[in-house]
């Protein structure tokens, strides 16, 4: 039966990627997107060969297009190391495209698990998702560190641009070897982090928690706490109270303990390092990185970039290159499309598109809950003795989702 395609009013930016995720990306478009939607895609190839060919200019162009059109949907990409430089014959070791895009958009990355009833969780009490936001700027990730090989004084010096007066602190008097580190953050970046976090929690109608260690880092982490409170009081308190949700600051150790015993259903705003660590902890606790969404949200809440939380699945791609069968989990990549298109639908007030995205996500979960799943999920249920008849291959899973999506659309759409 022919479908009357849903018209997507405004464009979306598509960022193609690398390896096995590039393979499943095409399956997703051909089987789950194009048969149902009439949409204008602004396509950018962020595959590593094209980034190298364009001297990485394509990454910057992609970010600029995202700011123009407000919605981007990204396939997983390779961040090259020395081995990849040799493998692809690259001109240089290009930076992470995610980092470049994130810096241009000034956004916060929010990761959220996809929960299926029949997939066991290492933390069984997590019956609702925990959405974790990582402030991916500054701190240890832009720090300057050094090895000290001899006795001497370590000092921290600040020289104001418009003054000759220095502020100088003696950090430590070394009597022997050691290590040292200096790191920073900016009010502008922390404020953007606060706005993105407040917006995301409000959209979900979930409470928001910020975790820091301000009892130890009284000034540094205290600045995060103070700015979040300022933003909340100025822009969000009345909205949160009307929605029956709240914002609260917690110590990181208290927050980790709370997370372990909670049922989920909240947004957790983390500083850079905490978010790096805790997002993988949450992914494993819920079952799999293959079942994690990742959305970069800008401070105004208008511009987002959606992607899968995992990498390019190199090991499966090597099998695919040799003509072997793979069973690669495409759910997080499908959800990149659904979350991006859902945001497009909200910006455009497109009820038909929003309904389609909800049915697409429900089709994914319904397919898994009916017993059709890829090997990684079957292993979580059946363990190492999983049999071949207990999972489907890469394309079979997407075909099963497409069938389930059609069934759901037919049941509720009189145009079909």
UniProtKB/Swiss-Prot annotation:
Gene3D superfamilies noted in UniProt: Isopropylmalate Dehydrogenase
Cite the entry's keywords alphabetically: Magnesium, Manganese, Metal-binding, NADP, Oxidoreductase, Peroxisome, Stress response, Tricarboxylic acid cycle
Annotated residues for binding of NADP(+)? 77-79, 84, 261, 311-316, 329
Q: What class of enzyme is it?
A: oxidoreductase
Tell me where on the tree of life, at the top rank, the source sits.
Answer: Eukaryota
Spell out the subcellular localization from the entry.
Peroxisome
* MF terms (GO), sorted A to Z: isocitrate dehydrogenase (NADP+) activity; magnesium ion binding; NAD binding
Q: Which reaction does it catalyse?
A: D-threo-isocitrate + NADP(+) = 2-oxoglutarate + CO2 + NADPH
Q: What is its EC number?
A: 1.1.1.42
Keyword hit for Magnesium: yes
Q: Where is the signal peptide?
A: none
| InterPro entries according to UniProt | IsoCit/isopropylmalate_DH_CS, Isocitrate_DH_NADP, IsoPropMal-DH-like_dom
Q: At which positions is substrate bound?
A: 79, 96-102, 111, 134
Q: Which Pfam families match?
A: Iso_dh
Query: Know the name of this protein?
Result: Peroxisomal isocitrate dehydrogenase [NADP]
Recite the lineage of the species.
Eukaryota, Viridiplantae, Streptophyta, Embryophyta, Tracheophyta
- State the gene name recorded for this protein: ICDH
């Amino acid at each position: 039966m022919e479908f009357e395609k849903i018209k997507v009013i405004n464009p979306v930016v598509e960022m193609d990627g690398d390896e096995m995720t590039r393979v499943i990306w095409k399956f997703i478009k051909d089987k789950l997107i194009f048969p149902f939607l009439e949409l204008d895609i602004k396509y950018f190839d962020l595959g590593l060969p094209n980034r190298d060919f364009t001297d990485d200019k394509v990454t910057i162009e992609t970010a600029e297009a995202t700011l123009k059109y407000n919605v981007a949907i990204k396939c997983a990409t390779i961040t090259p190391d020395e081995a990849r430089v040799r493998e692809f014959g690259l001109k240089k070791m290009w930076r992470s495209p995610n980092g470049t895009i994130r810096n241009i958009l000034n956004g916060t990355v929010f990761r959220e698990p996809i929960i299926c009833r029949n997939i066991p969780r290492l933390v069984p009490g997590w019956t609702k998702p925990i959405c974790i936001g990582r402030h991916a700027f500054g701190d240890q990730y832009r720090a300057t560190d050094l090895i000290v090989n001899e006795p001497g004084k370590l000092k921290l010096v600040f020289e104001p641009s418009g003054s000759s007066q220095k502020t100088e602190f003696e950090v430590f008097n070394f009597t022997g070897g050691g290590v040292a580190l200096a790191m920073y953050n900016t009010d502008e970046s922390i404020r953007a982090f606060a706005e993105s976090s407040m917006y995301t929690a409000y959209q979900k109608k979930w409470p928001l928690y910020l975790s820091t260690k301000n009892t130890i880092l009284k000034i540094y982490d205290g600045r995060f706490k103070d700015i979040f409170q300022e933003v909340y009081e100025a822009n969000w308190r009345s909205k949160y109270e009307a929605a029956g949700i709240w914002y609260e600051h917690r110590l990181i150790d208290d927050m980790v303990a709370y997370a372990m015993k909670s049922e989920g259903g909240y947004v957790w705003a983390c500083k850079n390092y905490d978010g790096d660590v805790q997002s993988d902890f949450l992914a494993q606790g819920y079952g799999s990185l293959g079942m994690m969404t990742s959305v970069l949200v800008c401070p105004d809440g208008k511009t987002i970039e959606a992607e899968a939380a995992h990498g390019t699945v190199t090991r499966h791609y090597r099998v695919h290159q040799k003509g072997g069968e793979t069973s690669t989990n495409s759910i997080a990549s499908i959800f990149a499309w659904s979350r991006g298109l859902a945001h497009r639908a909200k910006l455009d007030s497109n009820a038909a598109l929003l309904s389609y995205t909800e049915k697409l996500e429900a089709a994914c979960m319904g397919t898994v809950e009916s017993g059709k799943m890829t090997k990684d999920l079957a292993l979580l249920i059946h363990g190492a003795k999983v049999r071949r008849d207990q999972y489907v291959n890469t394309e079979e899973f997407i075909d099963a989702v497409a069938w389930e999506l059609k069934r759901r659309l037919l049941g509720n759409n009189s145009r079909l």
